[in-house]
Amino acid sequence: MSRAWRGLLPLIVLLLGAADVRPTQEYLSPEIRAAQEDPSRHPGWLWVEEGEALWRAGEKACATCHGGIAAMAGVAARYPAVAPDGELLDLEGRIERCRTQHQGEASFGRESEALLALEAAIALQSRGMPVAVATDGPAAPFLEEGRRFYQTRQGQLNLSCGQCHDDNAGRRLRGDVISNGLGTGYPAYRLEWNTMGSLHRRLRACSLGVRAEQFPLGSREYLTLELFLASRAKGLPVEAPGLRR
């Protein structure tokens, strides 16, 4: 194989793997899907309303710089993204950085009610828009890390992410339908949690499910995996805040 073809191989594999990726909402039951689209039936809207209030709260409110929260349309569709300093940030990380560096406030903390609420309200502004994360330039090395994580067998069960979410997508496991494992609906209200939660909380649950190491929320491992999942979802609609079983 020529050097040029070897260089293109990771891209070819990525494109082939994404060929059958479907929006997560297509794997939901009719009842869950209908409730996800109906604010009066979606418990996550309590967090959205709290997030909208947080957007306007404080002397240095988010609204002071950005105006109405509708100005965030399209933002969630572009995350994770590489910041000018070279750090890979998900939407939660971007919110926290804005809070500490520009608002002079203490960080909310990963998985806190306030951060999830603000993230849900911001993500809602991109609902229905196509995922459009950057995967070239400074994002390329992070993408490759995430791809390796996705394809590597892990834990006592010796399973990779792809063995569930590619090879067995559409089949049932513990009464639920296996999706393509995209993060387009997060943050999401999960009925099993009885609360709103982040994608990284869900990834930790997946790690636990295969009896593998659970990495910290916001870890490089989960951030790069999140970027890879978003690359698989490019062109598919943002569903956040989602509703999941």
Q: Could you say what each language-model-derived stretch is?
A:
Residues 71-75, 171-174:
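Short Cys/His-rich "knuckle" micro-motifs
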Residues 104-132, 212-244:
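C-terminal capping alpha-helices of c-type cytochrome domains
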Residues 1-37, 41, 49-53, 106-107, ...:
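N-terminal export/targeting leaders of redox proteins
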Residues 46, 50, 90, 94, ...:
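Extracytoplasmic/secreted proteins, especially bacterial periplasmic and envelope-associated proteins
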Residues 52, 94-98, 102, 106-107, ...:
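A structural feature that tracks compact, well-ordered secondary-structure segments
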Residues 33, 52-59, 72-130, 150:
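Hydrophobic, ordered structural segments
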Residues 24-57, 124-154:
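Electrostatic cytochrome c docking/interface patches
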Residues 58-69, 118, 146, 156-168, ...:
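The canonical Cys-X-X-Cys-His
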